[in-house]
Amino acid sequence: MTQSNEIAAELAHRIQADNEHFGGTMPEATAISWRGYLAAMLEWNLIAVAAYDELRAQVPAVKDDPAIAILRGRG
């Protein structure tokens, strides 16, 4: 089974590739997708909290981030 740090490294590579693809300005829809994907990885214990925080910092902020609302629960 792939180790958490290997998964985090692969995700970092993919995020960097997307940032380069979009000329350093990732569109909001892509950022929302990445944030949701990272939240799922965290929830299923595929990456550690520290890795999640580091990876999320590489993705542009999203106002009223739906991934955070889903991850934490709405109620």
PLM regions with names:
Residues 1-75:
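Acidic, Ser/Pro/Thr-rich low-complexity regulatory regions
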